[in-house]
């Protein structure tokens, strides 16, 4: 039996990664989100949660959970704190994804294994995957999407983008680049074409 292809979808903030993954999932792929996995670790009274509390302080505990908003306010704009938080979370996220992949392989029911990893290249994790799909979009378009979706500020967008490596560098390294500067329908069509091409390599 051929191994189940491991595909990562990555890209800058508000580029369209989640939308692409939704299309892949609708077409039958198994999809997992690194962000959602990391959020699942944001609970107190666990070893990971306690390490995060030790790093950022007990004030991040709100209503018996670790507040993502409180965490974001502390780490965005403070690179040292952000990197320290990532050093706690990313190994756990990668371990979880690899365990999930092993489980999905055994199920033998999905054509592709897709993992949405925003900071794939930044944490040096691309080599684990068979192929990397980069979703790209112009900065102005991404900012407009971010502001509309989150109600955040230009500053909050810029702070989030600061952690990401250059788009040009990622384009050179990615196996597939899907541009998302047009309509949602145009983008979804491109992703569907990508899915068909990937299935053809199995």
Curated annotation (Swiss-Prot):
Pathway: Cofactor biosynthesis; coenzyme A biosynthesis; CoA from (R)-pantothenate: step 5/5
Record keywords, A-Z: ATP-binding, Coenzyme A biosynthesis, Cytoplasm, Kinase, Nucleotide-binding, Transferase
EC code(s) of this entry: 2.7.1.24
UniProt subcellular location: Cytoplasm
A single cellular component GO annotation: cytoplasm
Gene3D superfamilies hit by this protein: P-loop containing nucleotide triphosphate hydrolases
Record-linked Pfam families: CoaE
Entry-linked PROSITE patterns: DPCK (PS51219)
InterPro entries reported in the protein's UniProt record: Depp_CoAkinase, P-loop_NTPase
Known role: Catalyzes the phosphorylation of the 3'-hydroxyl group of dephosphocoenzyme A to form coenzyme A.
Annotated family: Belongs to the CoaE family.
Protein name from the UniProt record: Dephospho-CoA kinase
Annotated source species: Chlamydia trachomatis serovar A (strain ATCC VR-571B / DSM 19440 / HAR-13)
Name of the gene: coaE
